[in-house]
Amino acid sequence: MAEEQPQVELFVKAGSDGAKIGNCPFSQRLFMVLWLKGVTFNVTTVDTKRRTETVQKLCPGGQLPFLLYGTEVHTDTNKIEEFLEAVLCPPRYPKLAALNPESNTAGLDI
């Protein structure tokens, strides 16, 4: 029996027009993680000047981006990335972590 795809929705900062995807590097990073994992997901843009009641209920006062995974709300880009790496793991989804743990600290002394 085929495994069900998780329901994933990424809420990102809208651009200056209030509708299109904005230029937030944190939103782009999470978008790329989901895309590289091969997950089907929805992207919802949030106009920071006019947050909807639904967004306020999901993540009151929360920073963008945030992730809705099923019914769970996840905030903080680094924590979201760690969560996705933990739940969307091999063999179904590729591992995105570096092969050599030392590469995570490369360049820190510059």
UniProtKB/Swiss-Prot annotation:
Q: Which residues cross the membrane?
A: 26-46
How does the protein associate with the membrane? Single-pass membrane protein
N-acetylalanine is carried by which residues?
Answer: A2
Bridged cysteine pairs (disulfide): C24-C59
Q: Does the keyword Manganese apply?
A: no
Q: Which domain of life is it from?
A: Eukaryota
Q: Where does motif G-site map?
A: 24-27
| Top-rank EC class of the record's enzyme | oxidoreductase
Q: Does the keyword Endoplasmic reticulum apply?
A: yes
**Localization per record:** Nucleus; Nucleus membrane; Cytoplasm; Cell membrane
Required for insertion into the membrane, as annotated region: 2-90
Q: Which GO terms describe its molecular function?
A: chloride channel activity; oxidoreductase activity
Known partners and oligomeric status: Monomer. Homodimer (in vitro). Interacts with TRAPPC2. Dimerization requires a conformation change that leads to the exposure of a large hydrophobic surface. In vivo, this may lead to membrane insertion.
Tell me, in a sentence or two, what this protein's role is: In the soluble state, catalyzes glutaredoxin-like thiol disulfide exchange reactions with reduced glutathione as electron donor. Reduces selenite and dehydroascorbate and may act as an antioxidant during oxidative stress response. Can insert into membranes and form voltage-dependent multi-ion conductive channels. Membrane insertion seems to be redox-regulated and may occur only under oxidizing conditions. Involved in regulation of the cell cycle.
Which family is this sequence assigned to? Belongs to the chloride channel CLIC family.
Q: What is this protein called?
A: Chloride intracellular channel protein 1
Give the species: Sus scrofa (Pig)
Traced from the root, the source organism's taxonomic lineage reads:
Eukaryota, Metazoa, Chordata, Craniata, Vertebrata
